[in-house]
Structure formats: C-alpha cells, structure tokens
C-alpha cells in the first residue's frame, strides 16, 4: 500500500491534507487555510486521527534528520492544534501516543532549540484533559530528560542558553506532574524513584545565586497563588523568566498536588538535598524559605506532618555537627508558627521530642566530649526558641499543658543535693519555661498557677543556682503581669509621683481573691527567702526582681505585702545574718520603694508622708547607698522637718542602718494607723515572720535559707503539697483592691457560740446618703470589743436569772419563725398561692388516666 502512495493522486486524502499544510518555500510558515481543512477533516473523521498523527511524526523525523527546522516546527504546530481541536475525540489516546513519540524524538536530538520546542509542545499536551485514560502510558523518559535539562550549565552544549534550558526542564517537570496527578491510573509519579529526580532538580534551581553573585535571597521571589497551570502557555509570562522564580512556583505546585500519603516521598528528598548541599549551615535562609513554601502549599491539617518529619530528621542527625543541628532547630522555630493548631494531635509528642533533644544536648555538653561548647549552647538556644514559637502557635490551654510538661522534666527539686549536670539542666529548662511563659496571657491566676505548678515554681525560686532563681522571678513577672506593667516595674526607682510610671491598675476579680487567700502565705515566704538568698555578685538584679514581683502583687494582697516589707526590714537589721552592708542597704531601699509605690496606689496621704519622711532622713544622714533622692528631681531633701540635733545624735560614720536609728526605719504602728484611717484592717500587720529555720545556725552563707520548711505563725495553718503551710483563709486580711477591705475575722469570737444573737446593724436607709455614711464608717475595734462584752454580759445574765421554759416562750412569742411546724405550714401556703397565680390563663392540666370517666354503654 505504501508503494502505491508514491504519487500524489494515489495518496489517501488525510496525507494529501497533511502535505498541503507545508509551504512550497522553505522560509514560509504553516499554511493556516489548509490547516483548517485538516482540522475539519480530523474532527469529521475521528478514525483517521491516529493515522494523521503517524504521518506527521514520520515527516517530522525525516525533516529532523535532514536538518529542516522550519518543517519540524510546522509539524509540531500542526500536532498542537490538532490536540486542542480534537480533545474530545475517541481516538485522542492513540493520537497522544504519536504526539509523545514526536516530543521524545525532539528531546533526543540534543539540540537546544528543538528541546525548547518539544517542551512547549509537551506543556500544551499536559493542559489537555483526556476523556478516556491511557493504560500503558509512561513518563519515565520525560522525567529523566527534563531533570537533566534542569542541571544544564555553560560548559555543556547549551552554552549561554543554559538558563533557557533549565527553564524548559522545569516547565517539562511541571507538565509531567500535572498530567500524572490528573490521571487516576498513573499515581506512580509519587514513587520515591521519581521524586528523587524531580525534587532535587527543583531545589537545584531554587538555590541558584543571583546575578550579583550573592547567595539565596527570598526577597527576589514573587508571591504566587495556588493555581497550577493556566489555560494558555503560562511559561511565557515575565515572572517565570528565571529558573529561580520558576522553580519556586514548581515546588509550591508540587506540594499543593501531594496527598497526605505522598508527603513523605516529597519531604525525604528535600531533607537529603539539604544535607548533601550543607544548606543547614546558619543562617539557613534557603532551608527556611523551602519549608515555609512547603507549609504554605500543603493542606493546613497536614502541616504537623512536616514538623514531625523535621524532628525525626533531627533525631537521625543527633551525632552531626552542631551547626547542622542549629540550622534544623532554626528552621523548626521559623515554620512552627505557620502550622498553627494543626499540630494539636501530636502536641505532647512534638514537645517531648524537643525537650529530649535539649536534655541530650545538655548531657553532651557536660560530658566533656563536646569540642565546641559555644556552638552547643547556640543549639540549645535554638531549641528553646523553637519551643517558644511552638507555644505561641497554640491556644492558651495547651500553653498551660506545655508549661506543666516542662516543669515535670525539671530534675531533683525535692532532693537536698543534686548533681552538677542536674543543676545545669534546671537552668536550661527554666529558660525554656520562661520562653513558653512569655507567650501566655494570664486571665485568672488559678488557671495557670495550679497547686503542683505553683509548688514547683516556689521551689525553683529557692534553689542553689542564682540564675535559676532569677529566671523563676521573671516567670512570676510574666504570668502575674496582665496589663503590661512589668516593663515599668522591673527597675523601679523611688518615684515622687507614681503616675509617671504609667501603670494600669484595676480591681481584683473574685477568682483571684480566692487564689491569693489560699496561697499568699507561700508566696510571701518565698519572697522573703529569695531576698535572703540574693547573690552578692549580682545583687541589684535579684533585689529588683523581688521588688517587681511584690509590685505586681500589690493590688491582690496589700496588707500581707506590708507585713512582708516590715519583715524584710527586720531581716536587714538582724545581726545574726552575715549580710554585707551593701546587701542590707539594698533591702532597705527595696522596702522604701515598695512602700512608696503602694502608698501612692492606695492614695493614702499620711502613709505617703511617712515614707517621704523616712527617705528624706536617710538622705540627710548621708549613709552610702541609702540616698534614694540622688536621682529624683525636686526632692524634698532640703525641706525636711527633722532637726539637726536629731541628726547628730547618732554616729556620722555608719555604713548602714541599725535598730537604734528609729528615725530611719518604718514603724509598724504608724503604718497601721495610716491604714486604719483609710478603712483597712491592719490586724495582721503586727504578726511577725518567724526567722528561725528549724533551729539552724545562720552562718552567713545563705544555705540555712535553702531546703527548709518554714514554720508559719498561723493558728489555722494547713499543709500544702510542697511542705509549705498556708495561712488560714479567715485569718488573712487580704485587700483585693485599693478600694475594698474584707470584713473583720470572726474566728475565736463569742459571736460564734450557740448563744450568739446575731444583731445586724439597724439601717434607717431612707436616703442614699445614709447608706453611704454607713458604708464609709470607720471600723473601731475598741468600740466593737466593748459592744461584744456588753452582749456577752446580757446573755450570761439572762441565762442565770431566767428559767429555760420562760426563755423558750419569750423567744417563740418574739419570733414566730422559730416554730418549725408553723414555718413549714407558712411555706406550703405561700407555695400554693404562687402555684395558683402561675396557672392563671394557662390551659387546664390533662387528667390522669384513672381520672377519666368512660361512657357507659347500654346493652
């Protein structure tokens, strides 16, 4: 048959139509009028489409071997137009096979221009949706060839056009992925053997340096949407003119098409590429950009899988250089916030893995085998930052879980002696806890300060390591500060006007009130011991940290912190404590600063005047380190009413305050009187702290303050889980705000006996002014005691002089409600009346089955 087709009249019609699209002149292009005839014939005769494709391929191969590029381009253009016109033809799969054979021949020519032509044709083919699938089509050759083109270099046959060849290879790989993922019968594109070629080819072009010779810069890559391919040839647009830009889009599209089961096949080549090309070396900007692109491209619910794969890779690289591990941890820190709440299912698993790596790094550093300790510390900081960013992406309740989990990993808090490695691990884990705590926003104290968590923090605040104690105070600052006041209180000075500090103050909630009533004893005793343990080498930081904690608790617990301040003053005066004069002066200054702050917050003029008087006396005495007015403008130093004779009564060479210098000390009675004048209950202000720690001798080293169980002076102490005793709720006068004072304690009062007669005050509340007058009335304990004695005497005289039956009859006549039977009858009547009123206007209640009267039948 082929022999009969040598002359034109003997050729079949489809061959004559194909031949007619070629021009007579070699330089002319495709004859579009004849191409339209060929297209119409192919659509009208779909059974001829396969033969048309075979003939076009035969002519293209012949022209390619004879080096006729114009005729080759005509054949390729004709094939592309037929593909687009006959996309719904039943013979399209057979025609597509001929088209792919033509593309393969062009790619095998090793001609840069022909490869460009083949790539464009293949991209056109990849955008066509076939109605019937092909069961035997394979793309192995195209993956190999396009991957090879992605690695083109100037030394190869491409010369200066190597960037064009790389772009063509990337477009070809994108076409292969698109064509494979849209065909359900070809899921093998996600096999590891194919991903090991596609992914490195994309990353190789993504890491290409810019024209200036600098390294990777993500700022040069524009943002793309999630669409994979346009209906037209999108490779001609300007934003894909360079391999770097095109490879970034290819990576995002590849990850966007990957299902959950295919993610591992894509992530593993990425990790391998980073290892081989040393892309983890700090700063890992390229690795961060790649994994951010991956996280943004995949489905949000699968983001945790990428985090888990990175952690698993960090497990496998535990023996690698510190720089590599630092890079992986930095990448984790950069992308974990993007994952958001999708990491919830593996929350504790991921956080436990990070903590395990942190402990392993600490053990390795302390083992003596670490050759680069600064790099190992950088690795630990990177892990801590990763855990902080990890916590920042979680909801608040999971942040609390993470803090509890971190606290549970802190070793040897209950032992008197711990190993050096454990102390260092405590330091690292407390820094981790501080990092997580900075991401948490406290709403209610009881929510975050659970019993176990608070007990652990109280123990951490008193450990041997001063850095751990300081970090624990910073944790308290972060969790107690709900109005961003800590930044203004961390280095609080002596302020003549506290409004200059710009604090935000509001009333305490009921929940926080109950929390502070329960735990104020433990917290104040911890603060007292923390001051005693303050390191002499870093004294100001520790004292300022305790002062900041006290200031943050000022609103929640006013009276108890005044009591603590007086105890701290007594501690500084105690000669048994082997403190330096500088430390004693720092404690005195801290007490003065706190009393000045709290006195102005509660707006108590007399208390403010007392504080200013003492501070002014100290400034005039000239004791080094006690003059708080040096850096204060408009100080009242020169106007102090203190006489010169009083100043000269003590020695001028003193370096600190002694108990004889009463004019330089704060007096508890004066403070109590000022508080009573403002309506505060200052009863517990005179209850001192017990400084004798189980009878231990104070040797001045500060160790007597560690690992001791405090003996609280409460009559209603209760044992806490950590060994502390909390003061009874009814015994603590805790002011929940500057405008509120709790009622007087009723404990150990005769009003609690069985003979008590509760007489509420008779309020003739005819006007609002009367109510205000009663509410603002000053509480006088002497007058209350006198009334209580009169009430007790009247009760005793009535018991002694009146018969029991007579007293019973008198009480029944005065108060009918004391008769139980009458009270019950009265309640039943009132309930019946309320029921009848409620049922007015309502439909009648349906009758019971046994109340229905059935009709009688006559037989």
Swiss-Prot record:
Pfam families in UniProt: EFR3_ARM
Give the region (Disordered) as residue ranges: 696-728
UniProt cross-references to InterPro entries, sorted A to Z? ARM-type_fold, EFR3-like_ARM, EFR3_Homologs
Instruction: List this protein's GO terms for biological process.
Output: protein localization to plasma membrane
- Give a GO cellular-component term: plasma membrane
Q: Where is the composition biased (Polar residues)?
A: 696-714
Q: Which family does it belong to?
A: Belongs to the EFR3 family.
- Name of protein: Protein EFR3 homolog
